[in-house]
Amino acid sequence: MKIDDLKERYSPIARLDKLPPTFTARVEAVEEKEDTKFPGYDALYIRARLTNQKLIESVKGSVVIQKFRPMHQAELLIPAMEKLGITDTDELLGKTFMFSAQRPSFNGSNPRWVPVALDGKRGKSTKKSAN
């Protein structure tokens, strides 16, 4: 296999401890699969590709993978999606979002970065047209 082909297959994973409170990334995949730390339980995994080259260099990777257990889904992800008018996780695919770090109310959990704005827009504009 050619080196260039191998490079296309592997994307370095960003170090979560180096991510800023907000960043922009394009969602590449959303899948529900078994939680690797708690076999028998499912979690939702969101894979997003960072869009800022300087950030990619500083976090040492271009891909962010966020795991949302059911408690994270209920408290953080679902409310964020509802604010954006998203009714299905499939609607996240292929779109670029601003992600924001949020901490759940329960102890012992790391922050999760949730989508808070689509392409820098937080929702529908309420401005009236000048015409």
Q: What residues fall within each predicted segment?
A:
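Short beta-rich binding modules
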Residues: M1-N131
